[in-house]
């Protein structure tokens, strides 16, 4: 497959903003874009780029959940409730250790947050706590476990599901009153998870993909196991994207091996296409993005500790659309069929919009065609002379 043409994201972006600290979390919906940064700043814009509000939390923002009229954020050691329209902080609660994940019901009346304690001598997480609050900030329940959850999804009734790392691995089912541990088909630790169109997909260290629907583990052949540790998953479109970290010479790595491998599958689990990166370059994020050429785009970001590459292809056909390079690492990405937001370690934020992206890419292609025709005409003139 041909290499994607190199483009500057600034030339393709709907708008660009520059924060004073690296971007650590993003939320994107039909009305707004919210960015959290490493210094605890939270910034909200409408989709035309007009600032709506700015507030300051205690420390690095690691995640968001939106329900009803509230934004819930995990920041440093705290979980914070923010009025979505004004940015006013309604309440905040200090957790034990560092805050990690947050989820809420669609109405925002039940909130679940997780925090973990990291042991420097053991170089591992030794304890996590799962916290349940109501919309007023009242702590309803808390439980501690020996594992760290790596993803969280919550049903409308407030029951949540959290895939775990070692020692038990498996999954926690968190009800309003207690926690229930459930083994998964693999005993491998979870690494990531994503909420798909109607279910949750969990990635594991051994390359397994587990599909969970309403708390039930589905025997679904759609989610093909991968040849290495799952790094990132996207499943908001029919089908899914997945990136893995694989060792040199592993099956599926191609000749000589590849540090990063990303694949696109259709809704039946058929492999559509894949991309590989050279040794030392890891594909850290995959995401479906704005429609181009009447199909969703597929976005991949990779990093080799020196240069970040964003590569964009047609989700179904795999045709390269463009790639962009930067000295700053992509740290967060959120997308849908209309917009895609990219946050970088140096504080740069881009919002990409479907129609503008399509027009800019078409304009570039037309310029290339015109240049090609001019070159041909010049050659013909030389032949005639």
Model-derived features with residue positions:
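Beta-strand-rich domains and repeat architectures in extracellular enzymes and scaffolds
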Residues: 13-43, 56-62
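Blade-level signature of beta-propeller repeat domains, shared across WD40, Kelch, NHL, RCC1
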Residues: 326-385
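Short loop/turn segments that connect beta-strands within beta-propeller blades
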Residues: 46-49, 83-87, 133-138, 174-177, ...
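Short, solvent-exposed loop/turn segments at conserved positions within beta-propeller repeat blades
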Residues: 74, 120-127, 164-167, 249-259, ...
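Repeated scaffold domains used in trafficking and secretory/extracellular systems
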Residues: 21-27, 59-68, 96-107, 145-156, ...
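A short helix->beta-strand "capping" segment at the edge of beta-propeller domains
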Residues: 1-21, 48-50
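WD40 beta-propeller blade core
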Residues: 43, 80-81, 131, 169-172, ...
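Residue-level signature of beta-propeller blades and closely related beta-rich strand-turn architectures
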Residues: 39, 77, 116-118, 165-166, ...
